[in-house]
Amino acid sequence: EMCIRDRLVNSHLDRFALSEANVETYRTPEYMLSSVQDYRPGAPGYQQHIWQATLGNRAIVYTNHPGGKNLKYSPNYWAGNEILPRAAQHKNVVVCIYNIPENQKNDYTHAYFPKNDFDEVLTKGNWTFGRKKDGYVALYSQNATTYQAGERGDICDLLALGRQNIWICETGTKTEWGDFTKFVNAISSAKVSCQELNVNYTSPSIGNVTFGWQSPFTIKGKEQELRWKY
């Protein structure tokens, strides 16, 4: 059944149109994790900010598919997305899948993860970890990542080459985990299996997570609703 919104807005033709956004936010005293669920995946983007982990005023983490280097326009290197991903969140875990078509010149995705704004940052395997006071964040990239300097010279740009990529973000706290090292070791040793545009991740905190470009979002085998029912 087609709703009025679907008849009026073609997300692949009108990147400026406003459409329904199902936002999920999970907040503790140490961090906030927020995302928009299954928002026009594969469609051209504009200024949409799909997800973000916030551990402080400047200690933030998010990913995007850049639209260009010129920061005066949107989408640009840091603001918005040239092609929108498919994202889903349950509590403290976000999965974000990018599927960039061949006709797009920017064949990579990247994360904003500013080293100097965290108290600790380290890399272990495909994971990058950060600590800000008693808040912890972990970011996984299916594709290999390299850190590079941003336009102001600060090391904040975590680049991942490839048109298809799966990113996972998990957050935690000292209260839950104790030492930051325990958080790092538990998540870096957790099972992550990526096949094409599907992922199976065994989160140490919420259990088994599965998601795909065309597959449902499940937690411990139970499908999760990505569109709110009013």
Locations of the language-model features?
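Ser/Thr/Asn(+Pro)-rich, low-complexity disordered segments
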Residues: E1, R5-Y230
